[in-house]
Amino acid sequence: FKTTIVNLKEDEDNMISLFRIDDRLIHGQIMTSWSKVTQAKRIVIADDDVIKDQFVCMVMKHAIPKDIKLEILSTEDAIKYLLENDDEISTIVLVKTSEVAYRIIENGIKVQSLNIGGMGMKPGRKTIYKNIAASPSELEALNKIQSLGIDVEFKILPGDKGVRLSSL
């Protein structure tokens, strides 16, 4: 469950314990399962829309334990934050879409794996695995991520058997 995101500076890395696409961002599965398994002490949300909604940000901040630091940032600010914070604090990075995940990766955040936990059905999306759906551009972003040698895995809960994008 450990994924190391390597900073552009050699021999320095951020400890990202989970890099996950989940359109719900903070919810019960993240707080009761993933945060415990990863022993996360920080959650970074990269989302250009959520950052503009003060009410949603407040609700998310109240939904996590006080011993976990929450950073809700725009995608650009999240990239800068991850590059600048090269500490070893166990961190969960959450994004809503594969396009944002790819944007983070293409801007210098190197990852070994990407967890896909929630991409629900909506107009323009087709089911790609169980309850996970993607638009053509989202699927293209997932394929680009995979082509970089990054393990792309569908896994809702830590105890579930993961299914790799490459096996579909």
Annotate the PLM regions.
Residues 31-32, 101, 142:
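Generic hydrophobic/aromatic pocket-lining and core-packing "Φ" positions
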Residues 8, 12-69:
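Long, hydrophobic N-terminal alpha-helical segment
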Residues 16-19, 41-44, 69-71, 90-93, ...:
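Structural motif
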Residues 37, 61, 65, 70-73, ...:
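NTP/phosphate- and nucleic-acid-binding module
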Residues 98, 107, 112-168:
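Glycine-rich, aromatic-bearing surface loops/beta-hairpins
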Residues 51-53, 78-79, 121-124:
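Short gly/pro/ser/thr-enriched loop/turn and capping motifs at secondary-structure boundaries
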Residues 71-117:
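Ordered, amphipathic secondary-structure segments that act as subunit-interaction surfaces
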